[in-house]
Amino acid sequence: FFPKQWRGVVMISLYFAGILCGILYALILKKTKYKGEPVPFVMELPNYRLPSAKSVGQLIWEKAKDFIQKAFTIIFAATLIVWFLQNFDAGLNLVTSTDQSLLAKIGSIVAPLFAPLGFGDWRVSTALITGFMAKESVVSTLTVLLGGNTALLQTLFTPFTAYVFLIFTLLYTPCVAAIATVRREMGTVRAAAGIVAVQCATAWIVAFAVHGVGMMLGL
């Protein structure tokens, strides 16, 4: 989607957009829920040392193993679910057209929410729904829905709407595992649901603002 000279700018802007939103969240919470005098916190830090090659290798292996396990569990499961919903209708009959499938019906219900952002196609909204399981599954879902023909992405996005899509994907709820962690740390389902709602609302508002500015600039 993006010209070669702009790809680095796109990636860096996404990186800083995430940082900026994190800072804004912190400032808002500091002025509202956590306002008051800060509690003194003292912690003795150990001496810093250059890590050994063994410890670095072990850390890399653990991170790689975690990703592989996720790829062969959550992402694989999401792909299977998408394939099933894509090929059957409400009566569990095999469909000849994806537009008649359960997946199309589910995506079509949600699609109007994303139309103001520039990507109201049901396939895009479906990919974002599966992203709740793992953000990586957004890509695999689009691949399945497009039959592996990534050239068809040009029919769903322009370079600008693709950027808006990346903004939304960056900012909305990370994954089921993150939600479960929030639920465990916060202690209630209500608190976790509230955080998910705030994250999704933030993603929509920021993406809508970016899209609006782009439209005014003729992008």
Give residue ranges: language-model regions.
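Transmembrane helix-loop junctions at the membrane interface of multipass transporters and ion channels
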Residues: 1-11, 177-188, 209-219
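Flexible glycine/proline-rich, aromatic-decorated loop/lid segments
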Residues: 1-3, 29-42
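Alpha-helical transmembrane segments
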Residues: 7-25
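Alpha-helical transmembrane segments and their helix-start/interface "positive-inside/aromatic belt" motifs
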Residues: 11-14, 65-75, 186-197
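Alpha-helical membrane-inserting segments
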Residues: 21-29, 33, 81, 85, ...
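Juxtamembrane inter-helical linkers in multi-pass membrane proteins
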Residues: 35-59
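Core transmembrane alpha-helical segments of multi-pass membrane transporters/permeases
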Residues: 40, 56-87, 124
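Extended, low-charge hydrophobic alpha-helical regions
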Residues: 79-200, 209
